[in-house]
C-alpha cells in the first residue's frame, strides 16, 4: 500500500478528535471518512494486475478522493484538481463538488457488478472504526505502545507487544457475492516501539500481513481435483459410449439409446470442463485475459458448459426415469422405437432455456468474469435452477413408483420374499446414479473445504453411471 500522500499536513490541530490511518497520519473524522473511502477503492481494485497496468491511480493529498486515469492521459490533465478523474462515494467525500460519484467510473475490463456497494461496505467499516475506536482512544488512559488504527481494510484497537489477529472482511475479495467460507485471519505485529514494519526494511511503512486471507491453495486444490476427476470421468465415458454405439444387439434398443445419449451428455460436460479450465483458468492459460475482459467467446463457452450441458444431464436422466416407468407401467414398448421426441426435448429444451438465459442476462447483468459465477440478479439464475430442481423432483417421485412396481411384480412368488426385496433394493440403488437423484445431496453450497468432495462426488457418480450402463449392456448383449 503505497499511494503518495503527505502525512505532515494531514495531522489535525484538535488531536482530541482525530482518527489514525496507518501511514497517512491523524485526520479529523470527516477528512478521515473521505480519505479512507478513496483508499478502500484503491486497495481493493486498483492494485489488481489487469488494472494496475492500464491505469494510473493514487490517493489525492487533499483527501477528497482517488485519482484514476488511463496510462495514456497527460499529467497536465490527470491530476487531483481535475474533477473528471477524481472519484469517491459522495456521502463519504469531504467535498462532493470536487469529485465524481464512484459508480460513474468505467474501467476496462469492467468492474464487478455493484462494485460501489462493495467499496461502501469498506467505507462504512472505516467510519465506524473512527467514531467507535479511534476517537475514543484520546479520551482514555492507555499506555499501550501501539495506538488504535485503521490500516485501509481493518480496524485495530490499541495493543500490547505481540501479534494481533483480525478476521478478513468480505469486501477485500472484490465481489458482492463472495463470502469467506471459514475464518481466515490477517495479522498485525505490535512491538515495544509501535506497530511493526517489515523486517527487511526498517524504514518501510506500517504493515499488516494479509497473506492469511489468501485462498490460492484452495483454488489450486479445487482446479487440480477437477482436472483429475473429470479426466477420469471422460476416460471411463468414452469406451462406454463406443460400446453402446457399436454393439449390434443393443444399439437400436430404445433403453440403450437413452443410455447412450445420457453418457454423451455427461461426456460433453466433462470435456467442456477440461477445455474451459485449460483455456481460461489454470496458471498461464492462453485465454486468461478474456476472463477479466468478460469476453463474448468465454461467456459462450462457460454458458454451454455450466448451463446447457448441465441441463441436458438432467433432461436425459429424466428421460431414463420416464421411459423406464412407462415400460414397467404399461408393459409395452417397440424395439424399433427411435425416441425422436425424447431427443428433440432432451437436447432442444435446454438449448432454448440457455439461449433465453444468455439473452436475459446480457440485458440485466452483463458483467462479471465470463459468467463463471451465478448471476447477482437471483431471478435470472432461477431460469436454470428451476428446471433442474423440477427434473430431480420428478425423478425422485418416479424412482419411488418404479420401486413400488418392482416389489409388486416380485411378490408373485411368496416363497422368495427375502430375495425379492434384495433384488428390489439392488435395482433401486442402481437407478439412483442413472436418474441423478444423488444430485439432491449437492444442492447446498459447500464450504471450500468440501468442494473437492463435491467434484469427486460428481465425477464418481458419472463414472459409476457409465459402469452400470456398460455392465447392463454386456448382460443384455450376452442374452441376445
UniProtKB/Swiss-Prot annotation:
Q: Where are the transmembrane segments?
A: 223-243, 262-282, 306-328, 344-364, 387-407, 424-444
Topological domains (Cytoplasmic): residue ranges? 244-261, 329-343, 408-423
Q: Name one Pfam family in it.
A: 7tm_2
Q: How does it sit in the membrane?
A: Multi-pass membrane protein
Top-level taxon of origin: Eukaryota
- Where, in residue ranges, is this chain on the Extracellular side? 1-222, 283-305, 365-386, 445-480
Q: Which InterPro entries match?
A: GPCR_2, GPCR_2-like_7TM, GPCR_2_extracell_dom_sf, GPCR_2_extracellular_dom, GPCR_2_secretin-like, GPCR_2_secretin-like_CS
The record's Gene Ontology biological-process terms are:
adenylate cyclase-modulating G protein-coupled receptor signaling pathway; cell surface receptor signaling pathway
Q: Which UniProt keywords apply?
A: Cell membrane, Developmental protein, G-protein coupled receptor, Glycoprotein, Membrane, Receptor, Transducer, Transmembrane, Transmembrane helix
Supply one GO molecular-function term.
G protein-coupled peptide receptor activity
PROSITE patterns according to UniProt:
G_PROTEIN_RECEP_F2_1 (PS00649), G_PROTEIN_RECEP_F2_3 (PS50227), G_PROTEIN_RECEP_F2_4 (PS50261)
Q: Where in the cell is it found?
A: Cell membrane
Give the record's glycosylation annotations as residue positions. 95
Which GO CC annotations does the UniProt entry carry? plasma membrane
Tissue-level expression reads: Present in the head body-wall muscles from the L1 larval stage through to adulthood. Also expressed between L4 and the adult molt in vulval vm1 muscle cells. These cells play a role in opening the vulva during egg laying.
Task of the protein: Not known. Putative receptor.
Q: Which family does it belong to?
A: Belongs to the G-protein coupled receptor 2 family.
What name goes with this protein?
G-protein coupled receptor seb-2
Q: Which organism is it from?
A: Caenorhabditis elegans
